[in-house]
């Protein structure tokens, strides 16, 4: 039968924020998104607005901006992605909406991923199939009479976020075609040291989703979104895996159980913390439960540029919160503490120093749901 909700691509990342203008200024400074289209939504622009099937009258405003893809590196270890990333920042104002609910529960964070555009007939088929599996629609709304937005309630199934499906009207309009009420341009409102910033974003290598039970979650990604193959690893502080591991500036012994997959034009890393203190448990799951913890946006191959980036970010209030050397030191990762600046998630960076030993780079095993299905 295929995926319950077939994915086209990553259309946008939905982030609930407390202060729209302040957030856009930090996105400009850190990620280089200077231009933002701002829209105000209330009963005038919203029609047939439902929350859990009940009529509601919310108001909120949004700012939509897109990263600029950096020049393609010819370095042999450079990442393959070259995809602009669109962020829709949402500041809830009044009334009931999925954004207001998220604000009440989490404050700020990645609330939804827009992954599909379907016509009305196709979406009704999708809705019925989802309902048969106990997955409902958290909210729906028609914008300017031209685009219907449906927020599928995948929070329990996939790990704390909604999946948005858009249904264009007869004219085929998408959200970006709707007129903005304002355009904000933050270029020239910040300064950076020479030779650093903004953080080069060539795409979303993966969304890091923290969950309680990895093995229970992965089959649902296959059933709902059609994710077929996962590389499974048990990351722990020991030679060849996590070396020089640190958390909040101190050495740390910890472990986490992960499944990683490239998917569509992005990817997922689903993470179950299993031992010791980490940002995943102490500052995320213990406080908020499951959800999108981070985005891998920055892949570097220049150790000097890597160090400059960390110093620059620390100087503007975005310290490195956790990290380690990986695979015998061939690679390193770190998390930049963008929680307050960007709105409830952190950004991952990866440094590729050299090609790792194939034995160290290999996962513990793969789970291939396509092969399992074919063998039945």
Please report, for each region that a protein language model flagged, where it lies by residue.
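A short, structural micro-pattern
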Residues: 59, 107-109, 146, 159, ...
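Ordered, small/hydrophobic-rich secondary-structure cores
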Residues: 83-87, 91-148
